[in-house]
Amino acid sequence: VQGMMLLIVPYMAMAFGAKESTGVILPMLCMADIMAVAYYKRIADWKTVAKLLPTALLGFLVALFVDKLVPAQGFRQLMGWTLALAMAVMIWSEIFGKENRWMHKWWYSALFGLLGGFTTMIGNAAGPVMSVYLLSMRKEKMEYIGINAWFFLVVNLLKVPFQIFAWDNITWGSFSLNLLMLPVIGIGALLGIRLVKLFPEKAFRRFIQFVT
């Protein structure tokens, strides 16, 4: 569940530094994504993934540019307001049972792809962005998981060269720590698969909203 990653990010930032922690976390995310795709490989709406990826890559470039201009506090405020607005759209749809009238517009997916690419590059924090997007699109549980698994695998693998060559955040030392964490990541993946099976559709949506 991508939104739960935000529980870990602050502690990693305190331990390794805000920017440096993104390079420590990224290989672990890639490992988890590979496990998720291995299990859910046949469940994906590729049309939705394809709508998100082009502007997600643009979000990478925006993040690299803005990183030099905006302080960390500014990023947190920007992300907070963006997520609050997106959550309001989703909650309105849930309470009043109305379809999001923007969901079929080309710019809606493009906007969330851009936000996802930007927030994942800055702080590995795109989980809530994608959660809000997919829930507002009223994706069912397994479709939600399949899209998330493939989108984040592709996006996180594409981030690796940026983290190595642009920000120098991934080193042999940090990667050795990632390898030590591999068994724990595997256990977490198995628990996540089990947890998903226990949730009925409506309870799953409520759980995602809560962790987001």
Residue ranges and their predicted role:
Residues L64-Q77, G97-N100, Q163-S176, L198:
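Membrane-interface helix termini and inter-helical loops of multi-pass transporters
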Residues P10, A63-K68, V132, I193-R194:
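Small-residue-mediated transmembrane helix hinge/kink sites in multi-pass secondary transporters
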Residues M28-M31, P54, L58-V62, L78-A88, ...:
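Lipid-exposed faces of alpha-helical membrane segments in multi-pass integral membrane proteins
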Residues D33-I43, L78-H104, I193-R194:
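Transmembrane helix exit motif
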Residues V1-A50, F112-G113, G127-I185:
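Small-residue-rich hydrophobic segments that form or flank transmembrane alpha-helices
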Residues L190-V211:
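Interfacial loop-to-transmembrane junctions
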